[in-house]
UniProtKB/Swiss-Prot annotation:
This is Ribosomal RNA large subunit methyltransferase K/L. Signal peptide: none annotated. It holds the Pfam family UPF0020. It catalyses: guanosine(2445) in 23S rRNA + S-adenosyl-L-methionine = N(2)-methylguanosine(2445) in 23S rRNA + S-adenosyl-L-homocysteine + H(+); guanosine(2069) in 23S rRNA + S-adenosyl-L-methionine = N(2)-methylguanosine(2069) in 23S rRNA + S-adenosyl-L-homocysteine + H(+). Specifically methylates the guanine in position 2445 (m2G2445) and the guanine in position 2069 (m7G2069) of 23S rRNA. SMART domains: THUMP. It is found in: Cytoplasm. CDD domains: AdoMet_MTases, THUMP_AdoMetMT. Its EC number is 2.1.1.173, 2.1.1.264. Keywords: Cytoplasm, Methyltransferase, RNA-binding, rRNA processing, S-adenosyl-L-methionine, Transferase.
Length: 702
């Protein structure tokens, strides 16, 4: 009896144990990452030929304690290598694990290689050669703490390489994991199986091979036992012949069918090639088709299983499309696949929740470094009384109501950018802004007392409902998470796409960027204030401080300002402002752009202006500013400097976003100024719910 070890992906150990026992293995013992078992020579070959789950089958040779590199060398050399393989065979060493002595895996592999070579040369035998790419023998050494485990890898290449996959293609899941997913899906061979996001077809091919009794090792050309001195070619040929006979019989007797589709024509072509190479191409129908076009291929029965490994996203900007995809799949399953089973394998359990289906079973597994889950569902047959469940129904109803109200209003006003929803319902704590045919959903970061999983699921429901109610393409929804602004945080960069969208606001054309920054380049709540500046600016010299992207300057210029001066500390935003001005034909010396610390510039400037707009941050301690700034504390000092630049009869429009801001009217009077609050006049319909989003004042000489 041989003592053997079969490795596998984390989470598949018990499944592998059952498979090995069915092959005839005895004394099976599950450990993390694999199964120890025993079997005769025939079982060695059968496990290599028939295991669909094992990553490798290894023959343990011994263990040794490693307190020095010499311990490793002597421990390896103690094995009788001349009984393992002939000197004419090539070999390679795979070394994994480190300790205080062996701190580099390459160094560990070199010491093992030296010990093996010396074991031959000391017996006056020819030195075996190393071949890292295609060796006859693979030696596996795993170092854990002070113990090195040494084994012969009888597999050669990993057993997931069945011999049918185009090696140029990147598989999101290995074939061994795909086989496990099939086994756990609840699908019964002999019933239909459909994968609507099949990629290169791995799940369907593994299922078809399982259903037709085709051994996973049947198409492999190389094995790790070819140079093994104890290899029994006669028994191996018997095992191989039996596998060939069973495969022919299984294919001839199989009567059901498999269906695969994907939106990518190139991967569908690869899937067809892979299926043909696997010997089961005639059983699978592959189509180029998007999930939105998915239909039941057997509407009159029999019932089958939909099995897939749908895409998932690691970036926030990919989530809206994936949420829409999963929501759509859930609706299609309910509408077209009543009575069928559904099984999905995913690295994102939250996305699976978008199906709006209740899972009957779930399994955990690792896909490389990713923690994944497989959930199985039974789709109830629909009845005449069945009504589709609405995702986030209260939110959807409010959004639909707001859309009806604001869409017509915005069209009459001549604006393309407006707020559709602003945390109207406390449990749906987001803002939804429309920018032409795009939508930005801003999630207000939930308090730490709210369960993170529930908050994320609520957000996914919001996105699915938003896409459904507004009827937009998922790739036209941008998702952001917003926290309370502190200083310069509003200017932090989120991406590098550099994609700008031209929008219209009254008679102005402006560039917005929906993805690269937390804000888009256009503060929607200041829309009316900008229009007022345009109406007040005819024939006047206009100054815009803390100008951001210069949208207020554009309105002033279009309103007939004699000159405009735009000041901001950010080169990025000044360049953006210049683009906005140029878009509206506002170029030349009359329109100056100045990069400077606005407070420092204000103290040093000696020019005069008729109309000044200033919208400073609530608080700022930017390294590039000379002093920290607090709008409540410092607004009088600001007004003192502004008064010096204000021409007789001129006006300052002063705005800020500090909640509870209190204007020091007595202090203003001492400066010879008076203030008129116009906050309510500058709040448009879409911001009527949030009356503290900004406060705005007109300041003139007393």
């Amino acid at each position: 009896m041989n003592s053997l070890f079969a490795s596998t992906a984390r989470g598949l150990e018990e499944l592998l144990k059952t498979e090995l026992e069915n092959l005839g293995a005895v004394e099976c013992q599950v450990v993390q990452g694999g199964v120890h078992f025993k079997g005769d020579t025939r079982l060695v070959y059968q496990s290599l030929m028939w295991s669909r789950l094992a990553s490798r089958i290894m023959l343990p040779l011994g263990e040794c304690k490693v307190y020095s590199d010499l311990d490793l060398y002597l421990g390896v050399q103690a094995i009788n290598w001349t009984e393992m393989f002939n000197p004419g065979a090539t070999f390679a060493v795979h070394f994994s694990g480190l300790n205080d002595t062996i701190r580099n895996s390459q160094y560990g592999a070199m010491k093992v290689k030296d010990a093996i070579v010396d074991a031959f040369t000391r017996k006056n035998l020819p030195r075996p050669n190393v071949d890292r790419d295609a060796p006859d023998i693979r030696v596996n050494v795993w170092l854990h703490k002070e113990t090195a485990s040494i084994a012969l890898d009888l597999s050669g290449d990993g057993l997931h390489l069945r011999g049918y996959r185009d090696r140029a293609g990147i598989a999101p899941i290995k074939e061994t994991l795909a086989a496990a997913i099939v086994m756990r899906s609840g699908w019964q061979p002999g019933t239909p199986l459909l994968d609507p996001m099949c990629g290169s077809g791995t799940l369907l091919i593994e299922a078809a091979m399982l259903a037709t009794d085709r051994a996973p090792g049947l198409h492999r050309g190389r094995w790790g036992f070819s140079g093994w001195a104890q290899h029994d070619e006669a028994i191996w040929q018997e095992v191989k012949a039996e596998a060939q006979t069973r495969a022919r019989k299984g294919l001839a007797e199989y009567s059901s069918h498999f269906y695969g589709s994907d939106s990518d024509a190139r991967v569908i072509q690869r899937a067809r090639t892979n299926a043909r190479l696997a010997g089961i191409g005639e059983l699978i129908t592959f189509e180029v088709k998007d999930v939105a076009q998915l239909t039941n291929p057997l509407p009159k029965g029999p019932y089958g299983t939909v099995l897939s490994n749908p895409p998932y996203g690691e970036r926030l900007d990919s989530e809206p499309a994936l949420i829409a995809l999963h929501s759509l799949l859930g609706r299609i399953m309910k509408n077209q696949f009543g009575g069928w089973n559904l099984s999905l394998f995913s690295a994102s359990p939250d996305l699976l929740s978008c199906l709006q289906l209740r899972a009957d079973k779930q399994y955990k597994a690792k896909n490389g470094p990713l923690d994944c889950v497989q959930k199985n569902y039974h789709v109830a047959e629909s009845t005449p009384d069945s009504k589709p469940a609405m995702v986030a129904e209260d939110y959807a109803n409010r959004l639909r109501k707001n859309l009806k109200k604001f869409e017509k209003w915005a069209r009459q006003e001549g604006i393309e950018c407006y707020r559709l929803y602003d945390a109207d319902l406390p449990e749906y704590n987001v803002a939804v802004d429309r920018y032409s045919d795009w939508v930005v959903v801003q999630e207000y970061a939930p308090p730490k007392t709210i369960d993170a999983h529930k908050a994320r699921q609520r957000l996914f429901d919001i996105i699915a409902a938003t896409i459904s109610v507004l009827g937009i393409a998922p790739n036209k929804l941008v998702l952001k998470t917003r926290e309370r602004q502190k200083g310069k945080n509003q200017y932090q960069k989120l991406g590098e796409k550099g994609e700008f969208l031209e929008v219209t606001e009254y008679n102005a054309h402006l560039w917005v960027n929906l993805t690269d920054y937390l804000d888009t380049g256009l503060f929607l709540d200041h829309r009316i204030a900008r229009r007022m500046l345009g109406q007040m600016s005819k024939g006047k010299d206009f100054l815009n401080l803390f100008s951001y992207t210069g949208s207020a300057t554009v309105h002033a210029g279009l309103g007939g300002a004699l000159s405009t001066t735009t000041v901001d500390m950010s080169r990025t935003y000044l360049e953006w402002a210049e683009r906005n001005l140029r878009l509206n034909g506002l170029t030349g010396r009359a329109h100056r752009l100045i990069q400077a610390d606005c407070l420092a510039w204000l103290r040093e400037a000696n020019e005069q202006f008729d109309l000044i707009f200033i919208d400073p941050p609530t608080f700022s301690n930017s390294k590039r500013m000379e002093d920290a700034f607090d709008v409540q504390r410092d607004h009088l000092a600001l007004m003192k400097d502004l008064k010096r630049l204000l021409r007789a009869g001129g006006t300052i429009m002063f705005s800020n976003n500090k909640r509870g801001f209190r204007m020091d009217l007595d202090g203003l009077a001492k400066l010879g100024l008076k203030a008129q609050e116009i906050t309510q006049k500058t709040l448009s319909q879409d911001f009527a719910r949030n009356r503290q989003i900004h406060n705005c004042w007109l300041i003139t000489a007393a």
